Amino acid sequence: MAYHLFKDYDKTNVLIGDGTGYATKGAKYFVAECCEYKDHFLWYHPDYAYINNIEMDHVDYFKSMEQYEQSFEKYANQAKKAIVIWGDDPHLPHLNYTKRVVKFGVKDGNDIQAKNVINNEKGLSFDVYIYGDLFGHFTLPFYGMHTLYNTLGVITLGYLEGMDFDYMQSQLSTFKGTKRRYVVKEVGNNVYVDDYAHHPTAIKYVIEETRTRFPGKQIVAVYQPDRYSRGLRFAKDYARIMDTVDHPYFVDFPKNAPKEPGIDIDVSVITKNLPRSKVVTEDEAGAKELAQYDNAVFLFMSPKDIYKLEDLVIKEKEKA
């Protein structure tokens, strides 16, 4: 989203976390998506360190929330111009910063604040106030509060680089989303969604967006955990969040999931906390089980290739 906002403002290069990107000579801006895993992001010394949130993850490397926060604090303070943070986060505002901090959010006390937020099946609309003054009213084809926060953060970056309201409203309204983030297929009266979500909070956001975007449809959610340490650490959280959908399903860890010392589990570490859930396989049998539902939104969530099961379900329903 940040790249999309900047690319028509001035020449902009981009590097996304999956290794893809775009570059041209003489670009003024370089937007890079960096990851905290194994402190990889400490190699970066950006002009702006833009941090959406802090929530414990990558538990095979980070052993405590204190260690996690220390890494983010160090990364943030490597910024040259400013640190841009979600001011409503329970952790970010309390870190020790040595550079200018600009906070965005919906709560009072943020430098960039969204007010009068409307979030429904038509999209998002909200007023943006900057240091107390109305900047403009945004109407965008996005869904969910998590998307509002992402958008507000990008608006903050644009403001810091001198963009005006008209440019940002126009440019953001044409943003089509990111790879493997809420990719929608509508076939008949059913909706199929592929999403990279792998942290419990990300799954929660996907479910919330679905309820907003497709009210009245039942939700069939399928999640495949990818790392044993993450599955073990967040087992109860996965179960609690998946319990909010009509029909919760899980797929076992992939066969190529990296082995981790001292951890010998399967997906039952999660499902035992949610007895009404079912386990399906990524084959025709699994597709038949899921295809029994109609007028539904099917959520397929995992960093792995669970979208292949989505394709099988669509084919199975076409047989009916």
PLM regions and their residue ranges:
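Glycine-rich phosphate-binding P-loop
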Residues: 1-2
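Short beta-strand-centered segment that lines the nucleotide-binding/catalytic pocket of NTP-utilizing
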Residues: 10-21
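A short, aliphatic-rich alpha-helical micro-motif
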Residues: 24, 43, 76, 242-243, ...
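Acidic, Mg2+-coordinating active-site environments of NTP-dependent enzymes
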Residues: 7-8, 48-192, 268-277, 290-294
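Switch II (G3) loop of P-loop NTPases
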Residues: 29-37, 192-198
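Inter-motif core of Ras-like GTPase G domains
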Residues: 45-55, 216-222
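Conserved acidic residues
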Residues: 28-29, 47, 81, 246, ...
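ATP-dependent carboxylate-amine ligase
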Residues: 97-100, 133, 156-178, 184-320
